[in-house]
Every structure is written in C-alpha cells, then in structure tokens.
Amino acid sequence: MQEYEKSESLYIVLISIHGLIRGHDLELGRDADTGGQTKYVVELAKALAKQPNVEQVDLVTRRIVDVEVGGDYAESVEALAENAQIVRIDAGPEGYIRKEELWDHLDSFADNLLSWLHGQPRWPNVLHSHYADAGYVGVRLSHLTGLPLIHTGHSLGRDKCRRLLARGLTMEEIEQRYHISRRINAEEETLSNADLIITSTGNEIEDQYELYDCYTPEKMAVIPPGTDLDQFHPPAASNASSAFAASLKNFLSQPDMPMILALSRPDERKNIVTLLEAYGESPRLQAKANLVIVAGNRDDIREMDDGAQGVLTELLLVMDCYDLYGRVALPKHHKADDVADIYRLAAASKGCLLIPL
C-alpha cells in the first residue's frame, strides 16, 4: 500500500473514462457517450481548482488516437485551467470505442493510471470516479493505494435495465447491447467500497440506488449541480440576433412564434421521436408554436452510429409523414457555448422547454 503525503492543500484526481473529453468546444451530443457527464466533469474540475484549499485537480480520461475524432483527444496532457489539467491514459485499442466495449480494457487503464500517479511529484488526497466504468477503476486504485474513493454514478444500470424491460426489450437483448450485468456488478462493488457517494437529488438515493444490494444511504450525500451564472442569465434584446436564431429561419416559416424546445443527444432513450409524433398529431399545437429539436451535431447521418442514425432517420420520416416542414426545426450543428443562447431564445419567444429523460 502506497503511503501518501498529508497536506492542507488538496490534490484531487477525477476519473471519467468514456466519451470525448477536452477543455474546449465540447462535442456534446456527438454520440451517446458524449453528453451531460462530459460537461459536468470538465466544469467540476475547473470549479474545484478555484477553491483556495485545492492545489491541483487532474481529470483523467482515456487517450484516443483516431483520425475520425480528431487530434485533441490524443494529447497526453491538456491544460484546463490554472491548477487543473486533463490527463489521458492509454488503455485498449487506440481508436474510439463506445463505453460498452471498454470493460475488457479497464484493468489496463487502472494499471497505467497507477504507473502515471507514481511518477507525479505528490500523491493525491482523494479519487473521485464518475460512472460505473470509472468506479470499477477507482475501487481497484483505492485498494492498491489506500486512497479514499468518492463516486458519482450519473446514471445507474439497474434503473436503466428496468426502463428497457418496460419498453419491451428482453434481458438477452439488453445484455447483448449494453453488457448490463458487468455494469451492475461494477456499481454494486463501487457502492460497497466507496467512502462517499455523491448524488444530484434525493430521488436518486431513494428510488434508484435503493434498487442495489449494497444500498448504503448513510454514505450518500446530495450535491445539486451548479449553474454558471456568467453563461446562464435572462434573455436580452441582443439575443434575438444570435447565430443560432438566424439558423432557425432556414427551417421555420414563422420563426417569431413561441418555441417548444427539446435539447438532447439523438438517443432512443430520450424519446424525442414520440415528442415529434405528439406535435404532429396536434394541429392546435402547431398553430400556437414551433417545435425545435436540438439533437446533437451531425454532418452525414449515414456515417453516424446505429443508435443515433436510427433516431435521426425516424425524426425525418415522422416530420415528412405529418408534413411538418416550416413548423419543425432540426438544426444540424450547435456549439456547447450556444446552449445558454438557445435556452434564452426559447424564453424570449415565450415558449417552453421540454427535458427529454
């Protein structure tokens, strides 16, 4: 067991393995693995680094060498903010793979991360894992080093399995597609070994973690996600001239009508196809408001993964079936920094926001 230096200034290691993580222009919605968790961990690292008792924050993820996703993700170290950086660790194939295919490579990730930690000037005070795959790694590192482990689940396998079964999928289908048993086993192990579990809501503790054999509510604490008030603020007159607002004019016959906004990645679990069908079934709603669905970023749907391709194709088919041209916008691109403007645009239109779950 490694002895680590006790210091008043904290060195925190965040572990978030899957998806595309970088310090600028986050590609949120590019695929099912690059969503809210990506934004969360990057902002968390920056916020922690600003704390007066924090000396260093390292956000550790998987290094990806793949021309299909770009060179940023191949950099071993990327400066994130003062006292914060992204560290990328090799594990498994060089190319980008979805999180369900990472399980066989997590032991390698843990070994390589441990080697990297041994080469640093000081030992961390705490490990903070994010999602089941990082929890698997965090448990092993905690056992090897004696470091305390904090864990944030973000989403949970047992809850997901329950929802998929309710939609009519069989356990065999769920296992084949999501390797759900490996995920749930990792979550049970993490719950059993972590010193602290962070959740966003009390519901997460009472209704989701309660499904687990290793349910330990006394080790759980609710820390609601924060809001960047410099970015998220009420709409101003200048908001109407934003680039995103201009792009909607290519889709909408009456762009000044109230907006029903849905923003999510193109994932079948988000149920945005049903939203479009409901809008298509309601001429009264169509007369009152436009529907704007911001479903990630796309260049060529034919080159996207099967899940995103299926959702986007179905959206276009439903849009055509109900002849919703001029009433529905499905913009192809937006930047992460556009999200606040998109929300303000919906508010300024006196529309509403739907949260696909």
Ranges and model annotations:
Residues M1-L357:
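Catalytic cores of nucleotide-sugar-dependent glycosyltransferases that transfer UDP/GDP/TDP-activated
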